[in-house]
Amino acid sequence: MSRVGKMPITIPAGVDVSIKEDQISVKGTGGTLNLARNPLVKVVSNDGKLNFEPANESREANAMSGTIRQLVNNMVVGVTKGFEKKLNLVGVGYKAAASNNKLNLQVGYSHPVNIDMPQGITVATATPTEIVIKGADRQRVGQIAAEIRAVRPPEPYKGKGIRYSDEKIVIKETKKK
């Protein structure tokens, strides 16, 4: 068995996990998340803990047990605490404004860039150069953050652009004459 797949998930109070034939649902204060069930993994619930076991001895089933376990763990953490990504805007005149699930970016183009947030994702701007994306689904939060970053990725000569708050940009040396 995979090392990740062996570890049980403790279900905190206030979280309801339902295991059906075709999907696993996790319901909590942060919302409801669903995951399609894989036939290679057996899910066993007992005493407030979830255990994941490979359905057979194949290598694929072993790997999938760890993957499904981590996805369900992310769902449990998402509906209890939630996930967030922080982005910073670096550049003269670069600013962001959030209102009514829309993000307005002014990042050096001749027009502002408007991005609509999907259901379950909230966006806030603490300062005009900081963007905070929050939600229960870790994958969707990361995907939206990547899409916002792709509007103006950091360039390697001056470092201007949209970057993750913990991202380090290696600045290149300019061409010598």
UniProtKB/Swiss-Prot annotation:
Q: Which InterPro entries match?
A: Ribosomal_uL6-like, Ribosomal_uL6-like_a/b-dom_sf, Ribosomal_uL6_a/b-dom, Ribosomal_uL6_bac-type, Ribosomal_uL6_CS
Question: What biological-process terms (Gene Ontology) are attached?
Answer: cytoplasmic translation
Keywords of this protein's UniProt record, alphabetized?
A: Ribonucleoprotein, Ribosomal protein, RNA-binding, rRNA-binding
Asked whether the UniProt record includes Ribonucleoprotein among its keywords, one would answer yes
- What's the superkingdom here? Bacteria
Q: Does the UniProt entry include the keyword RNA-binding?
A: yes
GO MF? rRNA binding; structural constituent of ribosome
Gene Ontology CC: one annotated term = cytosolic large ribosomal subunit
Question: Which Pfam families does the UniProt entry name for this protein?
Answer: Ribosomal_L6
Q: What SUPFAM superfamilies does the entry give? A: Ribosomal protein L6 (SSF56053)
Oligomeric and partner information: Part of the 50S ribosomal subunit.
Query: By its UniProt entry, which HAMAP family does this protein fall under?
Result: Ribosomal_uL6_B
What the protein does?
A: This protein binds to the 23S rRNA, and is important in its secondary structure. It is located near the subunit interface in the base of the L7/L12 stalk, and near the tRNA binding site of the peptidyltransferase center.
Q: Which family does it belong to?
A: Belongs to the universal ribosomal protein uL6 family.
Supply the PANTHER family for this chain. Answer: 60S/50S RIBOSOMAL PROTEIN L6/L9, LARGE RIBOSOMAL SUBUNIT PROTEIN UL6M
Q: What is this protein called?
A: Large ribosomal subunit protein uL6
Please name the gene that encodes this protein.
rplF
